[in-house]
């Protein structure tokens, strides 16, 4: 019911910060997504979001949503299955039996939060393995060298477009490709993946804009 007032202020673009389901206390402000198809219960439902975007459009207001690409919450169904030993689920992330490969990465990859979350990997006691966690230990990096990851994340992106989101802001997109011996930032493969996403969106939802965080 506040949209007419927002419109009267001259607003024609609303940027929604992360609002998808994420675990309380381990949500990084919503950037640790546990379910890409559900809204945080305290904010409402996906149907509420559809109603909101529809009303925004009636008011001439475009809607932008942060879409977290680099990682999922450790509570995501893929991560839970990986923790339980599912090899297919583990292939969606970066799992290692020991610290040998992670330590090679650490030689060239800078820390995002050196004080609050030092390092880029976390030991998972439940499965006695190391997983890549560039941001926080509860945010597991996705492996975009696995085609399933790209396909499913594009599916999640298109799902949000079908909910009425006009602009998809690709959060942490420079981090999505990992390669030993590099800083794992803004590598050429990142640009290739984003171009592929752009091609797909131009075919399926040409009115949707992709906005990359750089």
Residue spans of the language-model regions?
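Receiver (REC) domain switch/active-site residues of two-component response regulators
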Residues: 166
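Acidic/aromatic-lined carbohydrate-recognition and catalytic surfaces
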Residues: 1-151, 162, 173-214
